[in-house]
Amino acid sequence: SSDYLSFKFDKFAPNQLNMYFQGDASVSTKGVLQL
């Protein structure tokens, strides 16, 4: 679910992007899909 995707995104994305997307789980999910 979102926590899993957020964790994976954190592993592949720089900390700056992680902090940006971390504000909203839905935004984080969309960011992963767009990448």
Swiss-Prot record:
UniProt keywords, alphabetically: Calcium, Glycoprotein, Lectin, Manganese
Disulphide linkage map: none
Post-translational modification: Highly glycosylated.
Protein origin, superkingdom: Eukaryota
Transmembrane intervals: none
Gene Ontology molecular-function annotations: carbohydrate binding
Family: Belongs to the leguminous lectin family.
Subunit structure: Homodimer.
Role this protein plays: Binds lactose or galactose.
Protein name: Anti-H(O) lectin 3
